[in-house]
A protein has these predicted regions:
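Hydrophobic membrane-insertion alpha-helices, especially the h-region
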Residues: 2-15
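Hydrophobic single-pass membrane-insertion segments
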Residues: 14-22
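Buried hydrophobic residues that stabilize the cores of well-folded domains
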Residues: 22-243
Length: 243
């Protein structure tokens, strides 16, 4: 691969690289630093994050302390709600308070909810995702507004299609227009492919137009390569040209 831009090194804090060091948690805990507790009350399962003192605590990277999931007679989740550490409804990412799920033979309708469990429009411009399943894998998503009409999301597309390899790993993402055809999104490309190593970890991505030709993204590169540290986090990104 040709290097389009200089290598961009993501600065990591010294504490992140020293797992044995004391960490200042004034800003809060991430989910990976917390224990998980679960209670079941009839059809509702409540999963909470718990700090080292045994106190239910909000995980700052996912935006809630407890998620309550209601299941139907087939053990499928039909609704979930997010709560803060005090047990009050909380907006995940400041955007929505819960999700509802409706199922048919080939697809699932996922609707975003407000604090009163009513459908709400996300900041991305849609209220519901209709997701087609192929086997157990999510294949196509299309977006709908509060009136059930197809809507273009803020990224400039009406839907997306996921491609998989024989191992079931997601290898591509194609942005779709209203009719399900590939379309160039505001990111500058229509198709993004993922490169994975022998362990299945994503180590790079490349961008293509609707015809499958390499294309420059809106940020100027044709793709990226990643190097990861021992913890699995990306600590170096190399930007690529068309070759």
């Amino acid at each position: 691969y040709g290097i389009l831009l200089i290598v961009f090194v993501v600065l990591l804090s010294i504490l992140a690289l020293l797992p044995d060091a004391d960490v200042d948690h004034d800003a809060g805990y991430t989910a990976s630093e917390l224990s998980v507790g679960e209670t079941v009350d009839g059809s509702v399962t409540s999963t909470s994050y718990v700090n080292p003192d045994g106190v239910i605590t909000e995980a700052i990277d996912i935006g809630y302390a407890t998620v309550c999931r209601m299941r139907d007679d087939s053990d499928r989740v039909v609704e979930e709600q997010y709560l803060d550490a005090s047990g009050n409804p909380v907006a995940r990412y400041g955007d929505y308070y819960g999700l509802s799920y409706e199922y048919d033979e080939t697809s699932t309708a996922i609707t975003y909810l407000d604090a009163e469990e009513n459908p709400v429009e996300r900041s991305d411009g849609y209220s519901t995702i209709v997701r087609t399943q192929v086997g157990s894998r999510a294949s196509d998503d299309f977006y709908y507004d509060l009136n059930g009409q197809q809507v273009q999301c803020s990224g400039g597309y009406y839907g997306l299609h996921r491609g998989y390899n024989s191992d079931g790993q997601n290898t591509s993402l194609t942005f779709l227009d209203k009719d399900g055809h590939a379309v160039c999104a505001s990111s500058g490309y229509a198709i993004k492919t993922y490169q994975r190593d022998g362990n299945g970890t994503v180590v790079g991505e490349q961008y293509f137009d609707t015809e499958g030709n390499p294309v420059r993204s809106s940020l100027g590169q044709y793709g990226e390569l990643y190097q990861r540290n021992e913890q699995g986090y990306i600590d170096q990104i190399t930007y690529l040209d068309a070759d």
